[in-house]
Amino acid sequence: MSNKITILLAVLLAVVACAQAHASHQRRVPYPLPRFLPRPHHTVSNHRIVGGFEIDVAETPYQVSLQRSKRHICGGSVLSGKWILTAAHCTDGSQPASLTVRLGSSRHASGGSVIHVARIVQHPDYDQETIDYDYSLLELESVLTFSNKVQPIALPEQDEAVEDGIMTIVSGWGSTKSAIESNAILRAANVPTVNQDECNQAYHKSEGITERMLCAGYQQGGKDACQGDSGGPLVAEDKLIGVVSWGAGCAQPGYPGVYARVAVVRDWIRETCGV
């Protein structure tokens, strides 16, 4: 009898351990649907910012929609007349010929102009498991024509610090909530940056936050980027400080959004595209 009890307890402990490991792993997931790394065969729905407001693209003229087969999959930011910055998990496994960007429109499905991607330069240290170094540069086939609705965003200096608690704006065509709700209009939300140690504590079960990441959001939740916003801009004081990367759900209390920190790869951006 005692041997049977011992075996039963061992089995129960193994089940609990597996469940905990699964829950921990599920916390670290990138933003495109279906919350796993996108592949060319995936179709990403029109999900958008949680707890935000509709805006005209003229208010965020650096915003682009990254598309595959004429479908919005991620956001991105204009760096120059030829280069876009997005998230590596948005382009991982993709060929340039399969991607286009739409610029100058508040709708990801119409208006503005559509430019083909000529080259993808994914950060060489990108890690699919930890979503570290989540950066990808896209070279466009033709030079952009700037207007009040298409403009490059300024970049921080290499290793420029981001203060805790400063207000930022994140924009995109991602989900307005954690469930599906289609809408093609550009949205934005204002969220404060979060102390690195506090964010590390929130995500300690999923290996924590690296130096290439920064966090923004409210302790009570309610406002955040979500599926479909990945690769899009996090801007503070008219500078691109972050790239929408990953999180635990969308706008969940105690779990701020996690962004790829732009300042730590400023030199790589300059070396790659001369910006």
From Swiss-Prot:
Question: What tissue specificity does the UniProt entry give?
Answer: Expressed in the midgut. Expression levels drop a few hours after blood feeding and pick up again 28 hours later.
Which reaction(s) are listed as its catalytic activity?
A: Preferential cleavage: Arg-|-Xaa, Lys-|-Xaa
What residues does the record give for site: Required for specificity? 224
Q: Which UniProt keywords apply?
A: Digestion, Disulfide bond, Hydrolase, Protease, Secreted, Serine protease, Signal, Zymogen
Q: Where is the Peptidase S1 domain?
A: 49-274
Which Enzyme Commission numbers does its entry carry?
3.4.21.4
The cross-references to SUPFAM superfamilies, in alphabetical order and at most eight, read:
Trypsin-like serine proteases
Entry protein name: Trypsin-4
Q: What is the lineage of its organism?
A: Eukaryota, Metazoa, Ecdysozoa, Arthropoda, Hexapoda
